[in-house]
């Protein structure tokens, strides 16, 4: 077995891993990025491909190059909800336009950029274990058939959902969140499909409800290349994703005579971000730390930020000669006070939805005003359910939701709890010493959520 010694070892060459490696390299650290796939397959990851735009990315790579190479459709102006029970719902984005990318090329560019700025990218490297001695000290892996031990001051876990590294690491006595279960994840499958004629929704991301609180999507990379996929919550009975997608595509005229160019599946978190994603010598980022919007599955912007912040904080800790939890804690604080609080708030609506049937949720979504849906699914993480707003649209909404008033009132209560929850996340502790008290405050709100919705505890 050969041994390599680095400042930082990043495991996983997705969005979070590449931004962590690029950031570390830009700061002059000796960093190795371990990617299990071959160089040809690097960047080939199951994804819906929709993002908000290149401005969401930290400026540690050539963002213009990324845009030119991978952003195939920058004209996403609306979300279209295909309603099986009535009129489709068209929600404009206004100034917040989005984009759809070629995910394979996007991933290739990130790996290229990490290499260009100084990270050593090791392809065909499969990590099998974590080394520890009172703290995480590195990983062992097989690289192109040879055993390699990577020693590092900090290991950045960017290995994705249900990370193997977390199974191998002893977190006893640390703050690292181990309250993780498969039921907090979603199973997803997507195909990239070329259609014979241009579609009329190349300016939209299209959603459609499926069984078990999942959704089916059509995201246009162009007017003739569509990313079509679906997912379901793992805490619900499973259903055959491939067959369900196939059956749906067969009902849509635009897919007649279409060609499947690629297909891939994956698990992704549909839970709040990990309460703490650090342990001595160890940091988790991206899907490996639950950095995904639990209602939409969107995770690219959060992963990019998390990778960047983790490497920045790790570099400072290494310079101090102390990579304990106290010195890595600022990373937790940055995540939780930024997108973490919004994702945690959105998770309440996931819990609420899971306590009701898909049909009931569809009826309610159909009846709600469009702006309310924008607020719920957008940046705010809560809806504008003010008294004035309710009075303004109350008559129409009340008539449309007849028979579901109790469930709609639950949504109103959950929305208020989501606002309270974000306030708690704004007070995320500045050091591990306040962590237990903070969790107690947060868990009081979660108890209220379970009482209001009747849902089984998720955590």
Task: For each feature predicted by the language model, list its residue ranges.
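N-terminal Rossmann-like FAD-binding beta1-loop-alpha1 element of flavoenzymes
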Residues: 2-33
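Core beta-strand elements of the Rossmann-like FAD/NAD(P) dinucleotide-binding domain
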Residues: 3-6, 144-154, 278-281
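Predominantly flavin-linked oxidoreductase catalytic cores and closely associated redox partners
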Residues: 13, 115-254
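Conserved Rossmann-like nucleotide-cofactor binding loop
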Residues: 16, 39, 162
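N-terminal FAD cofactor-binding segment of flavoenzymes
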Residues: 27-29, 37-85
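Short beta-strand to alpha-helix junction loop
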Residues: 92-112, 233-241
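C-terminal helical "tail/cap" subdomain of flavin- and related membrane-associated enzymes
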Residues: 315-459
